[in-house]
Amino acid sequence: MKQKCVLIITDGIGYNKNSKFNAFEAAKKPSYEKLFKEIPNSLLKTSGLAVGLPEGQMGNSEVGHMCIGSGRTIYQNLVRINKVIENKELEKNENLQKLLAKCKRVHIIGLYSDGGVHSMDTHFKAMLEICAKNGNEVFAHAITDGRDVSPKSGLNFIKDLKEFCENLGVHFATLCGRFYAMDRDKRWDRVKEYYECLLGKAYKVPNLLEYLQKSYDENVTDEFIKAAQNENYKGMREEDGIIFINFRNDRMKQLVEVLNSKDFKEFEREKIFENLLTMSVYDDKFKLPVLFEKEKIENTLAQVISKAGLSQLHTAETEKYAHVTFFFNGGKEELLENETRVLIPSPKVKTYDEKPQMSAFEVCDAVKKGIEKGEDFIVVNFANGDMVGHTGDFNAAIKAVEAVDTCLGEIIECAKKHDYAFIITSDHGNCEAMQDEKGNLLTNHTTFDVFVFVQAKGVSKIKDNMGLSNIAASVLKILDLEIPKEMNEALF
């Protein structure tokens, strides 16, 4: 069976038997049609317990790539944090106790929704409650979502938070959309707007809930809400404590850098803050206290390939680069021996419906070069189905799928020419459900299964009831390497 192998992750493309508002079904996709007819294929689970999330919880790119790259189900931070809160153990956390003892005033920052991808509203409320009951003066800074949940769901979430704050005697200080507060593509002008808001230098309003409704009236939805502050909020002081409740790291790193890094030079800052506490490890370089330390994940797919002395290429465009490197490698940033990484810049557009092909063709070229160079293993992510799916633009999502389909055709042809095996799958669904039955836009991930295709010597059938955690062992089987005991079985 020994063959070199390409693993293609088509982000945000899932299987939905309902063809209505299904961008995957509506797209012209000759490469996929050929795959369905000629290549062994099946469906994989990408949500809930299958990927270490609560039952019924939609999967996401972080969880999906970690599951694929580690070859096992890892209980995610969401599940770990839920358990600690349920057992009343969060308030006993040593780092939290230290911060609350040191700082009289405490600011809680995070994405406020029940999306469960970056954060959870219940975690935000639990933290507010712990800090308030401890006697600290507490300020809530809510980031509106509209991406992992529906675009105007924020009104109910923020109403809930406002009432919760009033009942607790907590200040509801600021409101801002994740487009600004949670940028991850070094668009520092966006983060600067949020930084100014936290310092008390933003647009002042008497009622943040009314401000949100007014934004809707002006066709500005949750993700894009401009930073605003309650008129009574005077800003953060340098001696204040700041707690970040997002458990996913990639969209909080830039904000933490702006608030805390002494070496930051992207724009002038009036204040730098020292007393920060993050829910999880956002970046090892920050050297900040955290509430939940990283779980060590050993013998990942990338590690096994590296230890065997084989070469590997990891490539994606900016939006998904962390997923094929940090997350795929089990939460490790450092480069492995014989591992090459190729980052293709994502296009500089406001939202990706403006350019649905994104940088797919450049990513495709990087893969073909890797095959021609003879890399033993290649993992690639095509971001289009997910990133364009998040915009809610159905026609743009169709074009996104068509761009991915074109790239698949080129990679498959190149792989066959050089006798490479390939596995094609997705980390989760998105673009296969762009509207609900009432016509509301769906910008979030789905809980649908995803396709998997395997073209390799001797493979004619894929086992039933498999998941993302079965892919790593499949790659190792194709490469003729020993499968470590930590991994789940192969797909075939």
Where are these regions (language model features)?
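Feature captures the catalytic ectodomains and active-site-proximal regions of enzymes
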Residues: 1-492
